[in-house]
């Protein structure tokens, strides 16, 4: 059976286009991750700390200096960059605030997440809570894209650190 040379060239052309698309998407994501890590390191540098554990997604990053027990957070939005940090020694508890609202349409009711925050409750009750804004429908779009899983992961990590810190006192 003889294969048409034109079909082979066409197939190779589409394979090349397909491959280039995925390579460009990968490189774009890696570039954004590096930019997020630069912002996170800048936040850590403010107090001469270093990021030893981190995650980035979209325009958001969270990290920790595991030696100093400080958590860092950065987020890029149209309004500018947000950089926050919280010392675990000053934290009583970490929790997730998942602020939702219910809407209706002809298909029935559905729930939308308006905000998703990682909230730090301070040991000193005179100080207010600090929140890391993982997701806000106003500037992140209408759908969560992994923010809830990241919030759950980091809430668990931070609470384990808080428990360890309290036991070592």
Task: Map each language-model feature to its residues.
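Structured surface patches comprising rigid loops and adjacent beta-strands/short helices at the edges
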Residues: 84-96
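Short, surface-exposed coil-to-beta transition loops
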Residues: 57-58, 81, 113-116
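Short aromatic-glycine motifs in intrinsically disordered, low-complexity regions
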Residues: 72-85
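Short polybasic amphipathic segments
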Residues: 69-74, 116-120
């Amino acid at each position: 059976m003889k294969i048409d040379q034109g079909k082979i060239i066409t197939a190779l052309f589409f394979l090349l286009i397909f491959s280039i698309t995925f390579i460009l998407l990968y490189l774009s994501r890696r570039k954004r991750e590096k930019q997020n890590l630069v912002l996170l390191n800048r936040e850590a540098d403010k107090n001469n700390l270093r990021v030893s554990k981190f995650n980035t997604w979209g325009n958001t990053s969270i990290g920790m200096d595991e030696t100093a027990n400080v958590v860092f957070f950065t987020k890029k939005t149209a309004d500018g960059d947000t950089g926050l940090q919280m010392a675990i020694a000053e934290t009583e508890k970490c929790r997730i605030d998942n602020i939702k609202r219910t809407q209706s349409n002809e298909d029935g009711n559905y729930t939308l997440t308006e905000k998703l925050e990682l909230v730090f409750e301070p040991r000193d009750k005179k100080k207010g809570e600090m929140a890391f804004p993982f997701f806000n429908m106003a500037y992140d779009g209408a759908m969560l894209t992994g923010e809830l899983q990241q919030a759950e992961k980091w809430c668990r990590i931070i609470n384990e650190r808080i428990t360890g810190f309290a036991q070592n006192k």
